[in-house]
Amino acid sequence: MPQRHHQGHKRTPKQLALIIKRCLPMVLTGSGMLCTTANAEEYYFDPIMLETTKSGMQTTDLSRFSKKYAQLPGTYQVDIWLNKKKVSQKKITFTANAEQLLQPQFTVEQLRELGIKVDEIPALAEKDDDSVINSLEQIIPGTAAEFDFNHQQLNLSIPQIALYRDARGYVSPSRWDDGIPTLFTNYSFTGSDNRYRQGNRSQRQYLNMQNGANFGPWRLRNYSTWTRNDQTSSWNTISSYLQRDIKALKSQLLLGESATSGSIFSSYTFTGVQLASDDNMLPNSQRGFAPTVRGIANSSAIVTIRQNGYVIYQSNVSAGAFEINDLYPSSNSGDLEVTIEESDGTQRRFIQPYSSLPMMQRPGHLKYSATAGRYRADANSDSKEPEFAEATAIYGLNNTFTLYGGLLGSEDYYALGIGIGGTLGALGALSMDINRADTQFDNQHSFHGYQWRTQYIKDIPETNTNIAVSYYRYTNDGYFSFNEANTRNWDYNSRQKSEIQFNISQTIFDGVSLYASGSQQDYWGNNDKNRNISVGVSGQQWGVGYSLNYQYSRYTDQNNDRALSLNLSIPLERWLPRSRVSYQMTSQKDRPTQHEMRLDGSLLDDGRLSYSLEQSLDDDNNHNSSLNASYRSPYGTFSAGYSYGNDSSQYNYGVTGGVVIHPHGVTLSQYLGNAFALIDANGASGVRIQNYPGIATDPFGYAVVPYLTTYQENRLSVDTTQLPDNVDLEQTTQFVVPNRGAMVAARFNANIGYRVLVTVSDRNGKPLPFGALASNDDTGQQSIVDEGGILYLSGISSKSQSWTVRWGNQADQQCQFAFSTPDSEPTTSVLQGTAQCH
């Protein structure tokens, strides 16, 4: 009688036979499908039950499958879990040990990618990266490897002493992928045709192109635009540069036209060379600022860290001193409550003060940039273009303070900046810096001056209040930024004296928040002041969103302006899926009040088609109506619209997308991000990618996933619920880690053709033995004969395919047959046929 691994309700013989027929071929072929019942029970069957066939032929030896996790050796696509944490997914080769259980083979390079201290283990350090390790347990004592075949999951347990301790979110630089060679262009084209009641007509077009070429780690980029109206048309090159990453420095090297970061001095454009650190190359948990938490555990303990009442970190630590440097703070301020729970249950607590400003760095982390070249003037400005050099650095001194500063110099301009930022504990975070600049203009007038800057930030979790204030003060009218210093014909009589900016937000109760923001600038030599103030309230209740906003502005060369707006947004899911209706009222000084009604929504299974209808009317009876739609396809996004009002009508149109030239051909795509992926489905068309609406492989089997996160693991999965009927995939998920600007390749091996249940008989017309292994002589695809001599095959076409069937090692225990589908179009997704094996 069959035996169950787990207790459960009893099955009838008929039910058991059905389970055998459906599940065993799946397990034996390595499909990775779990053979379970509705109650998720796993069954074990004694092979003795299966040793007799209808034909009386000797069956295949299935004794190896009587042991848990025992399967056929080979290469499997598996999820790798290391110490109960998923670390990657890749193809691993398995061999059978003396107990017929599968054990994994690793190369030394793969062990290095897993974070094993290869160079510190003598038995591994002396081997090349391509060397194969058959038994990891013999090299690293205490290691265990278990292959969960049903879930295609390889569980590794490796002592912590043999592993590097990596920060959360860490991805080994050995996995950073430069990508494959490519040429591409990103384009955005828009146009409009305006017709006026008087009979006039105007047309405009605009084309934005971001072009690129990748070869190895190098990235060549060009940004150009084209504009056209009724009178003129023009091409403009915005910038061109060559860039690559420097992994050892976690930095980017750039040659060409770009702009400085503006972290210390005001940003400006240049032509030259720049080397700057890239925080994207750091693990997620080490970006930005967070303090290093240190303490001492008296035993094996659990350390829990809370911020604003939420647990943001929890980990097991050994007895003795510990250090935690990979926190993800939940907000910019809010002290950290650290709890140490010892093995006997006793607890100790202490408070780690915490507040942060944007420039603050973690203890010991250096962020820098070094730039040299020629200042690059704006296209329409009258400016000189001197040679210059700039260097900036920001260094995390400790848990409290960050130091920063910079130098900038050219023939007629010198600037020095220095500052310090720090946490004030419960009082928030504060930074103060001072810049001195010496400037000489073409008319030999010389100036020098100082700029003081103070920034303050504070979160008050008890009241859900956020406060941010910045104050700039210029000691005299002689301070000029580098942009201002290079501008000819400068108005020296309008020099800024000070500026204050503030932003306050307050959550008053769940779903409702208030905000206030504003700024004021005043100037030397006059009493003029520019002011801008905004206040508002917003919230959401029962799915209905609302906001009320007021803005006041005053500028020296303009009249005071006041504006009030009210917005309501109501979901229509009950009547019209994925749609909302909204109302907006806008009242502005000296202008008629305007009312607008709008309907927005999306259609098709993944929202690829979006639409909007809008009607507006003001108090002077001016009206405007519009209809717009856009469609997001694998080859780009297409949009069109029409609007008309009292005096005019307008047609508008546009298309955005990308064109990618790669080693296998040309693929059209949606608009590309910084890094992207080329999907290769081995010629299968219509294969969709999860979480990327509109993305599907083209008739050649290629698609482009337009945006990925650089230096982090990205999961690319096929939407198996919408696979074409003639496509089977060997694996449905790939993980990629692209470098900045890279196009990485993700290949999904597809069997293209039809699914067939073929009854195979021997030369005497008798069914082949149950459990015999059938292999495709060309593709290597495998299947298992069931108890009726039936094989499940996929990827079958009208072209004849040769298969070899084996049920032993003797010459009379194997045969061959050929099979193909009819030339006519099949009417079902799973065909049936017969074949004779010789």
Curated annotation (Swiss-Prot):
Where in the cell is the protein located? Cell outer membrane
Gene Ontology CC: one annotated term: cell outer membrane
| Stimuli inducing this protein | Expression is negatively regulated by H-NS and subjected to cAMP receptor protein (CRP)-mediated catabolite repression.
One Pfam entry for this protein is PapC_N
Keywords, A to Z, come to: Cell outer membrane, Disulfide bond, Fimbrium biogenesis, Membrane, Signal, Transmembrane, Transmembrane beta strand, Transport
Q: Which GO terms describe its molecular function?
A: fimbrial usher porin activity
Q: Which GO terms describe its biological process?
A: DNA damage response; pilus assembly
Q: Which InterPro entries match?
A: Fimb_usher, Fimbrial_membr_usher_CS, FimD_plug_dom, PapC-like_C, PapC-like_C_sf, PapC_N, PapC_N_sf
Major location category of this protein: membrane
Q: Indicate the secretion signal residues.
A: 1-40
**PANTHER family cross-referenced by the UniProt entry:** FIMBRIAL USHER DOMAIN-CONTAINING PROTEIN YDET-RELATED, OUTER MEMBRANE USHER PROTEIN
Query: What family is this?
Result: Belongs to the fimbrial export usher family.
Name of the protein this chain belongs to? Outer membrane usher protein YraJ
This chain is encoded by the gene named: yraJ
